[in-house]
Amino acid sequence: MDKHLLVMKWDYKYDKESTWFDEDSGEEQYELKEGASYTLPHIREISLEIRSVKTEGDLIHAEIYVDHNTYTVCNNGESVVAFAYDDYMVAGDFVSQSLCMKFTVTQK
């Protein structure tokens, strides 16, 4: 069986009381392995979990879990968009982080 990867293109935003703002973007590739768990870029408190991987002929379905939400990603479908958020206080300042992710499945 061919190996497949879960590809995640991501955009990150960080805002501290509207006084300091930062952005970043990138792409990660993860082995499409049922039960695997990966740390997200920038927001390390939230992980990406691959709950199940099913093959039906040439079609690959992956069920993933990110920040309290479950998504299904297929190798012949459109990108699946997911979001992760983390808000907290630092020395009395409110900090907001967000990660917009677009997932696809591709052959290795």
Predicted stretch roles:
Residues 1-108:
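Surface-exposed, beta-sheet-biased, low-hydrophobicity segments with strongly acidic/polar composition
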